Amino acid sequence: MAGKGVGTPLSALFLLVLLVVTIGMMEVQVAEGRMCKTPSAKFKGYCVSSTNCKNVCRTEGFPTGSCDFHITSRKCYCYKPCP
């Protein structure tokens, strides 16, 4: 019977730690959030290099950018966290 008294607090502690870790992971996912996509206003031509696209997007005030397909061509799109 003494073993049952010791196991219960340890099980409760384990579940509490598991809950805290799970909640912590959920907060990180929410903090990352969605990224909003906007066509670059300054990038000209067919987008081949995402590095060039990213650099142009940074001059437009966006943290990043990449070449993405748009219908039949590749265009430069800039990304920022959605409000």
From Swiss-Prot:
Matching entries from InterPro entries are given as: Defensin_plant, Scorpion_toxin-like, Scorpion_toxin-like_sf
Q: Which UniProt keywords apply?
A: Antimicrobial, Defensin, Disulfide bond, Fungicide, Secreted, Signal
In the UniProt record, which is one GO cellular component term? extracellular region
> Keyword Disulfide bond on this protein?
yes
Signal sequence annotation: 1-33
Disulfide cross-links: C36-C82, C47-C67, C53-C76, C57-C78
Pfam families assigned: Gamma-thionin
Q: Which GO terms describe its biological process?
A: defense response to fungus; killing of cells of another organism
Where would you say this protein principally sits, based on its record? secreted
Q: Can you say where in the cell this protein is located?
A: Secreted
Q: What does this protein do?
A: Plant defense peptide. Has antifungal activity.
- Which family does the record assign? Belongs to the DEFL family.
Name listed for the protein in its UniProt record:
Defensin-2
Q: Which gene encodes it?
A: Def2
